Amino acid sequence: MARPGPGVLGAPRLAPRLLLWLLLLLLQWPESAGAQAGPRAPCAAACTCAGDSLDCSGRGLATLPRDLPSWTRSLNLSYNRLSEIDSAAFEDLTNLQEVYLNSNELTAIPSLGAASIGVVSLFLQHNKILSVDGSQLKSYLSLEVLDLSSNNITEIRSSCFPNGLRIRELNLASNRISILESGAFDGLSRSLLTLRLSKNRITQLPVKAFKLPRLTQLDLNRNRIRLIEGLTFQGLDSLEVLRLQRNNISRLTDGAFWGLSKMHVLHLEYNSLVEVNSGSLYGLTALHQLHLSNNSISRIQRDGWSFCQKLHELILSFNNLTRLDEESLAELSSLSILRLSHNAISHIAEGAFKGLKSLRVLDLDHNEISGTIEDTSGAFTGLDNLSKLTLFGNKIKSVAKRAFSGLESLEHLNLGENAIRSVQFDAFAKMKNLKELYISSESFLCDCQLKWLPPWLMGRMLQAFVTATCAHPESLKGQSIFSVLPDSFVCDDFPKPQIITQPETTMAVVGKDIRFTCSAASSSSSPMTFAWKKDNEVLANADMENFAHVRAQDGEVMEYTTILHLRHVTFGHEGRYQCIITNHFGSTYSHKARLTVNVLPSFTKIPHDIAIRTGTTARLECAATGHPNPQIAWQKDGGTDFPAARERRMHVMPDDDVFFITDVKIDDMGVYSCTAQNSAGSVSANATLTVLETPSLAVPLEDRVVTVGETVAFQCKATGSPTPRITWLKGGRPLSLTERHHFTPGNQLLVVQNVMIDDAGRYTCEMSNPLGTERAHSQLSILPTPGCRKDGTTVGIFTIAVVCSIVLTSLVWVCIIYQTRKKSEEYSVTNTDETIVPPDVPSYLSSQGTLSDRQETVVRTEGGHQANGHIESNGVCLRDPSLFPEVDIHSTTCRQPKLCVGYTREPWKVTEKADRTAAPHTTAHSGSAVCSDCSTDTAYHPQPVPRDSGQPGTASSQELRQHDREYSPHHPYSGTADGSHTLSGGSLYPSNHDRILPSLKNKAASADGNGDSSWTLAKLHEADCIDLKPSPTLASGSPELMEDAISTEAQHLLVSNGHLPKACDSSPESVPLKGQITGKRRGPLLLAPRS
């Protein structure tokens, strides 16, 4: 069973109390109902009521009505003649929230008494209020909207809006405000969201004038602001919309909008801006809309939009833009609407819209675009999502095949109000999504090239948007292209110009004159105009020559030629040039010819000669200017082989002017060439790098031990830079030079011949250059000659020499007399005109008794072994026969004074010919000779010319001389065969030949009166050695002559020191001159020089 609710169970208990309360209420109700729930007060006179709104506007009221109902929430007193407000009239309006007092004659902000506290919106526009008094606003504690526009307020001070106000929207537009004090709105910083200051007289905004962190909209349009300084709007952290249109702003300094990181919309239209740069837009990272129309913008700097990468809509209409360069719109990847209408754009660079991947609407109406559509391809590359393109009202006369390349997503294309005359085949074919194509032209050239267009338009259902009428040929003029039969589109002529001569790319040097030539042909008589473009911009004041002539082959075709002259070209003339030839039927564009202006390189830094020490760093500078910028290259000694490069000690920076070589070495020394080269030419400059090094010895000197009479050499191979000067010292003093001391060039080799005991000592090689001096030493030790004569007194030597000479002379003359008598018995002398040479007389004896050339070969052996020998008491140096084979190539003479007849102590030389034969040199007596004893390392090998075995016993002297010439070849050798012989050491003894010769000549002349078989001494002074043997020629003469010659020769052959000359043959017996001389003879032979 359910329990009863509490109300039911408790009803009996509450009934008395409830009844008592109801009784009291009924007793008091009549009084309170009369006071509060009486009848509603009527509307004020001359006002209308609508709900809780009381409308008293437009009544011409000069004073407030007295019967304003208390229930009024919205009171409209606008459009009256109120000049003052009686606050008492608002005493009972406790519900009042909106008060409209606009369009009256109030001169100050009125006070509404107690009702001011609840007023939320106060409209005071179009009055005559002169100022804003902060004290008058203190009572409006609930005020959120205050409209003071269209009054006569001239200034806003910091005291105008005291703290504590809750104004959210403040309108001060259309006043006369010219002074805007910094911090004037600080009292509203906590509440103000919208501030309108448009249509005032503000000329300058103070920096940080607005410290309103909650403000979202700021309207400053139609003022007189000329410049926006940086940080002007700092403090407006929440600003979203800024209106600055219709001012006189000509420049935005860098950071002008810094701090507006949340701003979405910026209005700058109708100002005087001339350019767009990134610095002025710095900080607008959240900007979505930028309105820049109706300015004077003529250029957009590179990266001008780099801080507006979230921009969705950009309005640049009604400006002075003439071209869109490749990077004019870079980094606007989020842009969806771009309006560029009503500019003067005539050139759109290829790739100008590259990167605008989000762009959907592109407005290019009312520009001067022609070539972009007629000639350029790829201008719209990158607009993959573009859906609408408007080119209404441009100067397009033809549409190229690839004009709209890259617009595959295009849906709306407007080409209206263009005098289009031709459209190339498939110009719109790639626009698969095209839904609207607007064309309106009455100038179409209806030839065979337009035949494709009508069926294509009808196939895509686009003919409704196209108004196209033929203008040529005359038969189709005025007809719509859709009504012309396909067979009527023919090409009987070519009224549109056709290029036949293209301008050519060229290169020029600064200051030269250049010209470009371009020719076209046309069958039309329509006037032709010529223009030249440079980098796709028309040259306004081009220096042109234009010609026209009738083509020879057909008189109906005209050829037109235009020549562009560029005089005294500079760098500013560089670019791509193109000619445009136009008539009524269209324009023809030539290829683009590039002009490159070059300047020969010239040095700004020239390398200089330097001299540095080894181990340091060499620094060579070289820099040059030119156009294009020259490339710098280095060479060493005309090549690219750098020792420093191989060793990684060379450093050349690509962008630096300095060439470094570290840890410099001698190998780095040379001439370094800096070459600056560009397409105009090249120039070079040389610098010599001299490496300085202290002297040093490359090969150390060694101590030497030699024997008396030998030759010793000291080699001092010095290195250093500059080349060291070498000086030889002995015992610390300058070396005393004699004829035995010889030097090679540079004194690096010192040779001492025939050394003597006095030559022993310490030899010093002193090497010096400007960097220092170095010394090297060598000790020379001299050993006495074994087996040769000992040191003795001069008197003893002289005595022994005299005795030996007398003995030898006697023995020699005994042999001579014996041989002479023996020969005289064997041969008889006939008194004929011919001289008969005995059969056993060798051919080197002439018919006139003179000694003819003996065919001898002298072989010098380098480095041969030294033969042992000793000197007998008679002064003859005997050799060991065991050391002399048949061909003696290693014979060595003893170091005995040499006697060469016909020579004085003057030195004599040998000149070696190119074929290794020796040429005789003259001595003091102008005769050639060979020393009687052989020098070291030299062997003499006689090679007598064999006598023809078939030769008859008698022969004429002419035949003998002919026979001698035939068997006298010059054999290669390293000595002399013509009587010249190189001394191995020592000087020559003095000769008495000058005294012997005249005596012998006289004797011979007196004895040979008839000239027959006489001993001619004309060549006596050229004999190498005096062979002390009987002469065959003397033997054949008279005994008196022979005896005189013997006595005279024996007397004069003594030298001044008392010694007789050494016999040429060291053997005890003489060998007769007959037959053929064999090679077994080991003694020296008589060497007779050639006559």
UniProtKB/Swiss-Prot annotation:
Positions glycosylated per UniProt: 76, 152, 248, 294, 320, 385, 686
Residue intervals of the LRRNT domain: 35-70
LRR repeats: 71-92, 95-116, 118-139, 142-163, 166-187, 191-212, 214-235, 238-259, 262-283, 286-307, 310-331, 334-355, 358-380, 385-406, 409-430
Tissue distribution: Detected in brain (at protein level). Predominantly expressed in the brain, restricted to a small subset of glial cells, such as Bergmann glial cells of the cerebellum and glial cells in the nerve fiber layer of the olfactory bulb. Expressed also in the skin. Low expression is detected in the thymus and heart. No expression in the kidney, liver, lung or small intestine.
Keywords from the UniProt entry: Cell membrane, Disulfide bond, Glycoprotein, Immunoglobulin domain, Leucine-rich repeat, Membrane, Repeat, Signal, Transmembrane, Transmembrane helix
Domain Ig-like C2-type intervals: 497-596, 601-690, 695-781
Quaternary data: Interacts (via extracellular LRR and Ig-like domains) with EGFR/ERBB1, ERBB2, ERBB3 and ERBB4 (via extracellular domain). The physiological relevance of the interaction is controversial; LRIG1 may have low affinity for EGFR, and interaction may occur only when high levels of both proteins are present.
Protein name, UniProt field: Leucine-rich repeats and immunoglobulin-like domains protein 1
Gene source species: Mus musculus (Mouse)
Gene (UniProt): Lrig1
